[in-house]
C-alpha cells in the first residue's frame, strides 16, 4: 500500500456493533459503493509489519476498512481526499444508525443506481476537486479570525 496511498486516517466511530455493514440507504453512502472492506478480527495495536500486511490484504484494494473493535480506516491519494471521505463516511454511519434506531427497514438503493451515482461523482476529477475545495474551506475556517487554531 506504500506508494499508493498519500494519506491514511482513522476514527473511532459509533458504528462498532458486531457485524455492522455500511448500507447503501441514502445518497452520501453511495459514494462508498464497493469501497468498504470489513475486518472482524482485532489483534490489538498494529506494532509490526505482519499485522499491517494482514490489514492491507483484508482491504483488498478498497479505500475504507471497518476494523472490529478499533474503528474506521480511510486511505486516499491526498490528505484532502482521505479527510473528505472520512467526513462523509462518519455522517453516513450516523444517518444509518439513526434510521436503524427507528425499527423500520432501511430503504436500500439498488446496486446499479449506487454504482452509477458513484461513477457520476468521480467523473471529470470531481471527487478530488470537491475534496480539495472542502479541505481548503475547513482550513480557512481554522486560520481566520479570533481564536484561530491552525497555521500553514
Locate the predicted segments by residue.
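Single conserved hydrophobic/aromatic residue that forms the stacking wall/gate
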Residues: 1-6, 10-11
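Glycine-rich flexible loops
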Residues: 12-152
Amino acid at each position: 500500500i506504500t506508494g499508493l496511498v498519500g494519506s491514511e486516517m482513522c476514527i473511532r466511530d459509533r458504528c462498532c456493533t458486531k457485524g455492522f455493514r455500511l448500507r447503501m440507504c441514502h445518497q452520501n453512502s453511495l459514494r462508498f459503493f464497493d469501497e468498504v472492506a470489513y475486518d472482524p478480527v482485532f489483534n490489538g495495536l498494529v506494532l509490526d509489519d505482519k499485522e499491517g500486511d494482514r490489514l492491507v490484504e483484508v482491504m483488498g484494494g478498497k479505500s475504507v476498512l471497518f476494523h472490529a473493535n478499533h474503528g474506521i480506516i480511510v486511505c486516499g491519494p491526498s490528505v484532502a481526499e482521505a479527510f473528505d471521505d472520512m467526513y462523509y463516511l462518519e455522517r453516513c454511519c450516523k444517518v444509518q444508525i439513526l434510521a436503524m434506531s427507528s425499527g423500520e427497514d432501511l430503504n436500500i438503493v439498488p446496486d446499479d443506481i449506487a454504482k452509477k451515482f458513484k461513477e457520476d461523482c468521480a467523473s471529470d476529477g470531481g471527487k478530488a476537486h470537491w475534496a480539495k475545495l472542502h479541505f481548503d474551506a475547513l482550513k480557512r475556517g481554522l486560520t481566520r479570525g479570533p481564536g484561530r487554531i491552525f497555521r500553514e
